């Protein structure tokens, strides 16, 4: 029987690849023989990670902006020129801001709406836009996998991170929509899942 978990030579794109989760996942996947594409906005850290990953497998770093579709399209072009395809997308870009968090001495009424909006943009639209740009390659191939990063804070208000938790809850819903849409309209071998890292 074929090894269902063999990822050797699979082209895996990781947004937010220089973050704690992205970097550790990238290292593990490279050790398994996957070809890793790191997309991140921090060039120095990206170049260092690219060199580290290239000692284990084949890797490419590209500067990106997950909120800019034109930049993502340029990233896709570079990935296809280098590797010819995209097998997996890991949407690991995300983060939080103090203004979108309820301070211990404040209430939800004190939230900074601009900060809240930025956190939703980064986490939700930073997942939606890369998915929209990269999924067409998988749709043409009739197979592939997208993994979105959700959070325990999306499931219950464990801490005061209301902006982050709200965005991650939306990602969970978006994941369900995309899973249904892609499987029914393109291929059942095109999967979309979300993981909920613990802390």
Model-derived segments and their meaning:
Residues 3-37:
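Canonical Rossmann dinucleotide-binding motif of NAD(H)/NADP(H)-dependent dehydrogenases/reductases
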Residues 95, 109-128, 143, 147, ...:
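Catalytic Tyr-X3-Lys loop
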Residues 151:
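Residue(s) in the substrate-gating loop at a strand-loop-helix junction
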Residues 73, 95-117, 140, 160-163:
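Conserved mid-core segment of classical short-chain dehydrogenase/reductases
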Residues 136, 180-185:
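Alpha-helical segment proximal to the catalytic Tyr-Lys
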Residues 131-132, 176:
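A short, exposed helix-loop element centered on a Lys and neighboring polar residues
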Residues 54-70:
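Rossmann-fold cofactor-recognition segment
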Residues 32-48:
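Conserved glycine-rich Rossmann-like NAD(P)H-binding loop of the short-chain dehydrogenase/reductase
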